[in-house]
Amino acid sequence: MIKSSYGGKVLADCIRDLGVNTVFTVPGESFLPVLNGLYDHKNFIKVITCRHESGAANMAEAWGKLTGFPGIAFVTRGPGACHASIGIHTAMQDSSPMIVFIGQIHSKHKGREAFQEVDYIKMFGVPFSKG
């Protein structure tokens, strides 16, 4: 029998399979399925709950800088991404390995000024990553 899965669980499974053992987040409704997936790996992945997205991003940036392994942050859409932007910018300037997952509105509402919708390409610029 094939076990059913969902996107958040698949993402959590993938980061666990890649050896990630710590993530930083401010829980948000735009990525609850991922948090559910991370809960399934609570014995392998430590979820550090932060009080503010800037803290989560700065902690992930520092983690990457100190360990050499990408610091992982999960933040919610709109204001969460804005608050995380300084940590993201610091990681880019210092070449710290960091991965940030940002929640998003439902695709059917995209481009319609939906609740807390932000154009992340315009906000963060292109390229979105540094190699």
What is each stretch, according to the model?
Residues 1-131:
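N-terminal alpha/beta PP-like core and its mobile active-site loop of ThDP/TPP-dependent enzymes
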